[in-house]
Amino acid sequence: MHFRKYLVGGIRKVKKVVKFGGSSLASAEQFKKVGNIIRKEESRRYVIPSAPGERTPDDTKVTDMLYSCYGQAILGEDAEKDFEEQLEAIKERYNSIISGLDLELSLDEEFKTIRTNFSKKIGRDYAASRGEYLNGIIMAAYLGYEFIDAAEVIVFDENGNFDGDKTHEILSARLENTERAVIPGFYGAKPDGSIQTFSRGGSDITGSIVAKAVHADMYENWTDVSGFLIADPRIIKNPKPIDVITYRELRELSYMGATVLHEDAIFPVRKEGIPINIRNTNAPEDKGTLIVEDTCRKPRFTITGIAGKKDFASITIEKAMMNSEVGFCRKVLEVFENNHISIEH
């Protein structure tokens, strides 16, 4: 693998962006694993954390807890008790991580702000984003890295569409002289300062955006699996791992249901020729899956992978003389658009 390098004090070093998913940051124990991974390589300079995920199969992700808590806030006085109890449960999740890491850190002021903004019904995107925001504060304190609020550097327009050019301009300038930083994933802000999130799993996208901004040599995406498998292990017994896959192959698998990496995380790094390495926080010795633009390696299998999606509806349209009616397909597609229905073809 060829790495671009940069000079620091005359020493040539590799620069990496590392993103950790919710399962990798669900508890203090998982945080410690992440800390060991980051400290093992000096090149891991920019960290993108997700919100705490499930600690056990019957646990609840913090993002879902925040959605539920905000739902109680919207109900007002009738649900005030449930709102306070749920907010306290979220606070306890974070405090358990802080105490487990022996950090001298208090999130009391942050939770006062969250309580106030929830009461003002500030929006679901703000509510959901607090999971990554708070985890970012803890991660920065734990590592001794600078904390950068994603709302300051990830830009959306007034309609909630991601502004890649503006983000790259602001983020590149902000990180130009920043050696090490923690930037929460999943969210950014509109011009008026209101919080806007990516779709679920959007921390993958944030990591890719940061990798592009700092001209990283590698974007490592750490999760709870050792990369992509040829098939879903819940359906196929003992599927083989995929060592190397191209962006194009990954894009197809992502569209068809492979969920290890958010499908939109490919674009920013692909344009810059930055490879992505999917790694396992719980098995850091595994090499995982390397995602590249192209490879000259001869694949082990004719088929790279198999993926699928459930709950599709198949629609067949029949009409006499349809092939001679100009604009027919456009009219059909407009029906889907007007009803906010995406299509696969």
Where are these regions (language model features)?
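Nucleotide/pyrophosphate-binding catalytic subdomain
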Residues: K5-I266
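Glycine-rich beta-alpha junction loops
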Residues: P52-G53, V225-G227, I276, N280-E285, ...
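Flexible, glycine/charged-enriched surface loops at secondary-structure junctions
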Residues: E104-L107, L261-D264, P275-P284, I317, ...
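Generic beta-strand/beta-sheet core signal
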Residues: I148, P184-G185, W222, R279-T281, ...
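Active-site scaffold of zinc-dependent metalloenzymes
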Residues: E272
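A conserved regulatory-domain signal marking ACT and ACT-like small-molecule sensing domains
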Residues: K287-H345
